[in-house]
Amino acid sequence: MNAIDWLLDAEPAIRWQAMRDLTEASPAAVAAERARVGLEGKGAEMLDLQQSDGAWRCSGKPVWLSTLFTMLFLRATGIDNTEPAVKSAMARLEAGLRWNNQDDRWELRPPETGGNTFFEGEVEPCINGGTLALGAYFGRPAESLARRLLSEQLDDGGWNCDAPTSARSSFHTTICVLEGLIAYERAIGTGLEVSQAIAAARRRGEEYL
């Protein structure tokens, strides 16, 4: 078995991307395979593990951490955001949790505690970059979050979660933010004022890197 055959013998999340990138499979065949991601394998498994309030929880870990990284995993599988099960999962997450700060600790908490919905983000650019990318992928692009990130760009062109204590950008934070901004820009198109501002900010961020 060669490497391509090995990838094609994997679960749908891997197989459809291997078909798209490494074979001559038709777009229809690739789309049909991609549609299976939310129905079987790890994509379906992660959807099934979502709790009633929209969170994914892991013992000993903050709710925001396990939820954010599960969402990033789902995006990496290429799960179809138009599938009913995916749309329901995103609606639960959006309705059931809020970002807020209690006792100097940001966390995802019940909606009655107030704060931002998941896709509106919190205060750290590295987290918000990932959150912005997720909102763009799952059909909930948040302009308020994009504008917040634009306002937090440092003089050297990048971003840093430790700003304003540090005036020097971080590669990690900058990459997280740039990934979010480009995903948002692709989701909304290039004709809007905010998309033009994003394009300019991205160029500065890329020059910093």
Summary of predicted features, one role per range:
Residues 1-209:
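Preference for long, amphipathic alpha-helical scaffolds in soluble/luminal domains
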